[in-house]
Amino acid sequence: MSETVHNRIAVLRAERGISRRQLADALGVHYQTIGYLERGEFRPSLHLALRIAAYFEVPVEVVFSIEPFPRIGGAAVENRRSA
């Protein structure tokens, strides 16, 4: 069973002004691993997922989901189109 794991790593990094390299260094992984994770090309181990959540000080379900995350501003755009 090959399920996609969706994540908000790029959003969390951008909100905090953290580069891929800075996050990778803090987690002890190669910076390209962060890019692979963000693009959905690599599924993290449970241990790495928990470490990423701990780094951002949020619950793991804020960072990772098997369901796509709603687009930011998507509802606002739809509401404006309906009006």
What residue spans do the PLM features occupy?
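DNA major-groove recognition helix of helix-turn-helix/homeodomain DNA-binding modules
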Residues: 47-62
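Recognition helix of helix-turn-helix/homeodomain-like DNA-binding domains
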Residues: 29-42
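Alpha-helical residues within the helix-turn-helix
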Residues: 14, 25, 54
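Short, charged recognition helix plus adjacent turn
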Residues: 54, 64-83
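A short, Lys/Arg-rich alpha-helix, primarily the initiator
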Residues: 1-15
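Conserved hydrophobic/aromatic packing and binding residues within compact polymer-binding modules
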Residues: 9, 23-24, 34-37, 63
